[in-house]
């Protein structure tokens, strides 16, 4: 019997956001799970900050809590990027996904409200953020035997 491995939901979520035209129109492909040393703004980071995995009966369903941050030069752009990411996740992120290096099935997304402000580490950059729970489980094996 082989182990059931849950998908890397942070990688799945960031790949999904990069695939959305409305997001890429604002940030190109700058949706990260780890921020680069050399940053070009605006940009987005998806970071797992908690959550649970449904392991009581079967190791199958992951319910990670993510913090999604968007940085930009102005508060207006930071809000637009943040709300665009939130809307894309809540309205579209459901179903079977296969991106390079990561696959999974997203069953639901619950997102919190947006917090606005300036980043204490990047005081000249505006930041918007929200939290979201992305319910996901492994994608079905699409290979034939």
What is each residue range found by the language model?
Residues 1-58, 92-103, 144-145:
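Small/polar-rich, solvent-exposed N-terminal microdomains that initiate assembly or binding
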Residues 3-7, 72, 122:
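Charge-dense, low-complexity intrinsically disordered segments
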Residues 50-53, 63-67, 87-90:
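Short, low-complexity, polar/charged sequence segments that are solvent-exposed and flexible
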Residues 60-78, 85, 126-138:
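Oligomerization/assembly interface segments of phage tail-like spikes and tubes
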Residues 74-81, 97-102:
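Short C-terminal domain-edge/linker segments immediately following a structured domain
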Residues 80-93:
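Short, hydrophobic/π-rich interface segment
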Residues 90-145:
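Acidic-leaning, charged glycine-interspersed low-complexity segments
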């Amino acid at each position: 019997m082989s182990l059931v491995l849950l998908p890397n939901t942070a990688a799945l979520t960031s790949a999904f956001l990069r695939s959305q035209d409305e997001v890429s129109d604002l940030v190109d492909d700058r949706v990260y799970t780890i921020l680069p040393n050399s940053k070009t703004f605006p940009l987005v980071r998806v970071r797992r900050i908690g959550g649970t995995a449904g392991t009581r009966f079967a190791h199958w369903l992951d319910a990670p809590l993510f913090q999604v941050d968007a940085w930009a030069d102005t508060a207006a752009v930071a809000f637009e990027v943040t709300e665009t990411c939130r809307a894309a996740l809540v309205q579209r992120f459901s179903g079977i996904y296969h991106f390079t290096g990561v696959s999974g099935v997203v069953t639901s997304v619950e997102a919190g409200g947006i917090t606005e402000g300036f980043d204490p580490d990047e005081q000249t950059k505006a930041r918007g953020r929200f939290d979201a729970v992305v319910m996901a489980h492994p994608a079905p094996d699409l290979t034939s035997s």
